[in-house]
Amino acid sequence: MTNIRKSHPIAKIMNESFIDLPAPSNISAWWNFGSLLGICLILQILTGLFLAMHYSSDTMTAFSSVTHICRDVNHGWMIRYMHANGASLFFICLFMHVGRGVYYGSYTFSETWNIGILLLLTVMATAFMGYVLPWGQMSFWGATVITNLLSAIPYIGTNLVEWIWGGFSVDKATLTRFFAFHFILPFIISALAAVHLLFLHETGSNNPSGMMSDSDKIPFHPYYTIKDILGLLFLILALMLLVLFSPDLLGDPDNYTPANPLNTPPHIKPEWYFLFAYAILRSIPNKLGGVLPHAMSILILPIIPMLHTSKQRSIMFRPLSQCMFWLLVADLPILTWIGGQPVEYPFITIGQLASVYISSILLXLMPIFGIIENHSVKW
């Protein structure tokens, strides 16, 4: 009798995706972040669902409904902080996952890579709209400033911003539609994640060496399921440490003040995971001139496969490219720090230097070093 997991139509799909899936025998802990992102998504959907049961998307009651969740709902404070800090861990896993893709040359799987970029943009949009929902000072002013960036688009910009707002300023219509989109987008992300996995399983997974591994594969279960469970335990530990000991560590104190359109906070900034892009935006003292590099900070990812000049896929055996990659990684925390600082000297200058540095590494130095490395091994 055939095993049910190999004969049942639904169980067979699960079996081929998570149990009998042939996986390279040498993939490292950097390949754990895909499964961790799946866990983060499930966690965010579940905690978000419970929060939505008590949340009111009206400008008059939104702030007090969040207060009510924290004070009066059973374990409401825990659900709220799990959702907020879960988003931070989601982005940490996302950045690690993308970084691994760049380091080991996973971007050569073009369909998987492009769906991944679409996923990243959708998650960023979802997180931004979620930040607006508590209707604190930073929620209101963050929404005003970030949506206003679209007014830099020639001719249609102003109309586009007012269409998104649903009026002439961020108000009740904006909050209601942001809540609706914030609720539906995680389900769209789930569908995109399924497509991402579908394309990945068409080609098979990459591995640290960047070489074909068809001759050396092992079943996903039990080897990598155990490995993923270990990663999950570390993720839960990090989340619980944040939620139970420092729930507001990654938040903004201004968001504990109800939104007031008549009082601008001294320093408007988005959540920490957007600060690197925000620093690039502020480094150019021109609206359109700042918006274009700001957009390119993410939209450079689809261009990376075109800039791949090396005959080796992975950076693992390319010392010059390794130096450039780790300098790039070191530059991102600097940009994140600058994005959270006031717009004054010396932060403006540091931000400008870091922005030029990141673009020169990605657009020029990495491709040049790829060619140099080809010649150094006489390829």
UniProtKB/Swiss-Prot annotation:
Pfam family, one: Cytochrom_B_C
Protein name listed in UniProt: Cytochrome b
UniProt-annotated location(s): Mitochondrion inner membrane
Cofactor binding description: Binds 2 heme b groups non-covalently.
A GO CC term attached to the entry: mitochondrial inner membrane
Keywords (A to Z) from UniProt: Electron transport, Heme, Iron, Membrane, Metal-binding, Mitochondrion, Mitochondrion inner membrane, Respiratory chain, Transmembrane, Transmembrane helix, Transport, Ubiquinone
Annotated positions binding heme b b566: 97, 196
Organism: Chrotogale owstoni (Owston's palm civet)
Binding site for a ubiquinone: 201
Binding residues for heme b b562: 83, 182
